[in-house]
C-alpha cells in the first residue's frame, strides 16, 4: 500500500513524502521539493535504549551514473543522532560477475530459512554491520544456527550464568529475591532470564538489576526488570543517562508493554554497594578502566565469583603474555575493593580462574 500527498518534518524542514508498506514495515520517503530526489527514508522503529525512534537513511550529493543518479553520501540517523556516515568513493555500474560465485549450494538452499515475518530486527542487524559484527539471525540475542537457546549454567549453589547468546548475565539467588548482573540485548532476553530464574528458584522478584555499564548491548533489556519493580544499580555519573532512557516513550517495544518508569529507584555507585539478605552478600564495585566511564564489576562473596563485562571476557581466549590496560583494571579493582575472587564470569565468553590474571598483573 502506498500513500502520497503527505508532509513530514525532519531537522526543522518540511518535506513532501510518500509512505508505503512492505514486509510488515512502513517506509516514509521524503523528497526534495525542487529536485524531486529522495532525501530521507524513515522507519518508525524501537531502540532498546531510546525507545520509540525515527530511524533514517539520509541521502545527499546525488551524482549521475550510467543514466541514473546515485547518492554518494548515505548517513544513518537515530532520532537525529548519526550512527553511521557512509561515502561512496568508487562505483562501477553493471560490473562483470562470475555467475558461479553467485550460485547458492544445493545443501544450503535446502536448509535455508523462510523469509522472516512479523517483528524483524533489521535495525539491530544493520547497526551490527556498521561495527563489523554481522549476526545472520532473526533472533537478535543469538544465532539460531549456532546455538539452540539461552541457558542457565550453574557456577555455584544459587549462582547462575546466563549463556548461549552473544551477551551474558549472572543471576544470584537470595532468600526472598534475586539479583541480576547486566540486562543485555533486549527485553525478550531479560524476560527469558526472569522466567528461567524463577523456574529454578521459585517466584522471587528481581530486587536489584546491576548494570556494569551503559552500552546498549549490555543494558538494552533493562525495562523488563524495571517493570518488576527492581532497583537499578549503576556506576558513578550514570543516573541522568538512565533517567533519560527510562523517560523515553516505548510504545513500539515488541517484547513488553509501555510503563511509567518515572519513579524507578536508581542507586549510583561511586565506590561499593552491598546487597544482602542477612546471609548471602552480593556487591557492585566502581572500576576505573579504559573502556567506559562508570564501570562496575560484580561479586558474590560466599561463592567468591566475580562478574565482569568487556574489559575481560573470561574463557574467551588465553591470557596474553603481557598484561593489557583493560585486564590490569580488573585486578586493580579487585585489590581496591578488597575482594578475593576465585573465578570471574563474563558478560562475554564464559568463566575463568582469577589467579592467573592476578599473577600476570603482578609479574609486570
Where do the language-model regions lie?
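Divalent-metal (often Zn2+) His-rich catalytic cores of metallo-beta-lactamase-fold enzymes
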Residues: 330-364
Amino acid at each position: 500500500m502506498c500513500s502520497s500527498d503527505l508532509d513530514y518534518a525532519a531537522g526543522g524542514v518540511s518535506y513532501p513524502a510518500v509512505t508505503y508498506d512492505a514486509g510488515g514495515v512502513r517506509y516514509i520517503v521524503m523528497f526534495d521539493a525542487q529536485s524531486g530526489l529522495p532525501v530521507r527514508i524513515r522507519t518508525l522503529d524501537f531502540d532498546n535504549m531510546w525507545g520509540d525512534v525515527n530511524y533514517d537513511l539520509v541521502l545527499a550529493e546525488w551524482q549521475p551514473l550510467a543514466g541514473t543518479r546515485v547518492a554518494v553520501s548515505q548517513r544513518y540517523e537515530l532520532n537525529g543522532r548519526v550512527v553511521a556516515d557512509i561515502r561512496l568513493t568508487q562505483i562501477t555500474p553493471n560490473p562483470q560477475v562470475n555467475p558461479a560465485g553467485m550460485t547458492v549450494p544445493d545443501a544450503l538452499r535446502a536448509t535455508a530459512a523462510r523469509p522472516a515475518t512479523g517483528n524483524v530486527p533489521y535495525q539491530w542487524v544493520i547497526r551490527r554491520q556498521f561495527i563489523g559484527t554481522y549476526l545472520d539471525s532473526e533472533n537478535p540475542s543469538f544465532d539460531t544456527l549456532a546455538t539452540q537457546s539461552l541457558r542457565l549454567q550453574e557456577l555455584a549453589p544459587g549462582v547462575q550464568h546466563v549463556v548461549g547468546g552473544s551477551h551474558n548475565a549472572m543471576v544470584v539467588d537470595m532468600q526472598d529475591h534475586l539479583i541480576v548482573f547486566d540486562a543485555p540485548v533486549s527485553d525478550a532476553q531479560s524476560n527469558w532470564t526472569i522466567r528461567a530464574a524463577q523456574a529454578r528458584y521459585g517466584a522471587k522478584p528481581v530486587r536489584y538489576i546491576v548494570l556494569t555499564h551503559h552500552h546498549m548491548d549490555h543494558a538494552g533489556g533493562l525495562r523488563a526488570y524495571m517493570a518488576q519493580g527492581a532497583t537499578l544499580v549503576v556506576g558513578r555519573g550514570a543516573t541522568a543517562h538512565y533517567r533519560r532512557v527510562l523517560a523515553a516513550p516505548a510504545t513500539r517495544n515488541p517484547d513488553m508493554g509501555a510503563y511509567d518508569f518515572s519513579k524507578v529507584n536508581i542507586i549510583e555507585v561511586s565506590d561499593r554497594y552491598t546487597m544482602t539478605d542477612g546471609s548471602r552478600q552480593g556487591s557492585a564495585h566502581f572500576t576505573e578502566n579504559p573502556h567506559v566511564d562508570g564501570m562496575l564489576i560484580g561479586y558474590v562473596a560466599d561463592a567468591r565469583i566475580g562478574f565482569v563485562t568487556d574489559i575481560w571476557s573470561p574463557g574467551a581466549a588465553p591470557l596474553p603474555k603481557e598484561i593489557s590496560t583493560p585486564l590490569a583494571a580488573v585486578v586493580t579493582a579487585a585489590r581496591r575493593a578488597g575482594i578475593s575472587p576465585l573465578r570471574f564470569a563474563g558478560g562475554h565468553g564464559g568463566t575463568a580462574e582469577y589467579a592467573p590474571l592476578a599473577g600476570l598483573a603482578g609479574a609486570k
